[in-house]
Regions:
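Bacterial Sec-dependent N-terminal signal peptides
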Residues: 1-28
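Active-site SXXK
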Residues: 70-97, 136, 191
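Small-residue-rich helix-interface/hinge motifs
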Residues: 94, 101-108
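Active-site-adjacent helix/loop patches that line small-molecule binding or acyl-intermediate pockets
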Residues: 25-35, 99-100, 109-212
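Glycine-rich, acidic and aromatic/proline-enriched surface loops and short helix-turn segments
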Residues: 40-56, 90, 154, 160-167, ...
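Beta-lactamase-like hydrolase cores
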Residues: 23-66, 71
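Short, Gly/Ser/Thr-enriched beta-strand-loop segments that form substrate-interacting elements
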Residues: 219-220
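Extracytoplasmic
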Residues: 43-45, 65-67, 71-76, 92, ...
Length: 220
């Protein structure tokens, strides 16, 4: 539960950050009072970072944790979408992947094999249908983005992880799980930097790909 909550926060960072404009001198404000939001959810450990580029203020709860690398989990759909569009795996955000008719169960982001005990696993009904990229992005459909990663392939994915300098840049042996199983790690601070570059179309992707992804993010 902790990790899920942490990455919901990072997703919030992403959504907020894209509305920013360029900044020069950054003021840092720490907000211990934001602990109540975590306590309300029964979370004993978490962090929050809100960067207001217009006012040039970085607002933190648990600043130390915001600098700690962790699995990007669902937030990796931003990068995954950019690579898919840039490599023509997806021509646009309307690219549909057909549902194979088999509900997928996950535990801590890892797919449970067919026939295995699913008591502690979860299944999201919104994932169990044909989805376009924009629809999959909105509901954070893990099966869709796992298939996208398989189609991209390890070599191409690694090339873009390196060019963007995304976290520790590690894929490991599983092209469809590395952002879920702690192989790839990135800090919330790094995520904010990534979102600033995306907002200004400064990532090593075409302007078209970056604008399509920003448009999908506005659905969140």
């Amino acid at each position: 539960m902790r990790n899920i909550f942490n990455f919901l926060i990072v997703a919030t960072i992403a959504a907020i950050s894209i509305f920013s404009t360029s900044c020069r001198n950054i003021r840092i404000d720490e907000h211990s009072e934001w602990a109540s939001a975590f306590e309300h959810e029964g979370i004993t450990e978490g962090c929050f970072e809100y960067y207001d580029n217009n006012k040039e203020i970085a607002n933190y709860y648990n600043k130390e944790m915001c600098a700690t690398p962790m699995s990007p989990a669902s937030t990796f759909k931003i990068f995954n979408s950019l690579v898919a569009l840039e490599s023509n795996v997806a021509l646009d955000e309307q690219m549909v992947i057909k549902y194979d008719g088999k509900p997928k169960y996950y535990n801590k982001g890892i797919l449970i094999p067919e026939g295995a005990d699913t008591t502690a696993a979860f299944n999201i009904p919104e994932w169990n249908k044909d989805l376009s990229m924009s629809e999959a992005f909105k509901v954070s459909a893990v099966p869709y983005y796992q298939e996208i990663a398989r189609r991209i392939g390890k070599e191409t994915m690694q090339k873009y992880l390196d060019s963007v300098q995304y976290g520790n840049r590690r894929i490991g042996t599983e092209i469809d799980h590395f952002w879920l199983n702690d192989t790839l790690k990135i800090s919330p601070d790094e995520q904010v930097g990534l979102m600033k570059r995306l907002y200004h179309d400064q990532l090593p992707f075409s302007t078209r790909a970056q604008r399509i992804v920003k448009g999908m993010m506005l659905q969140e």
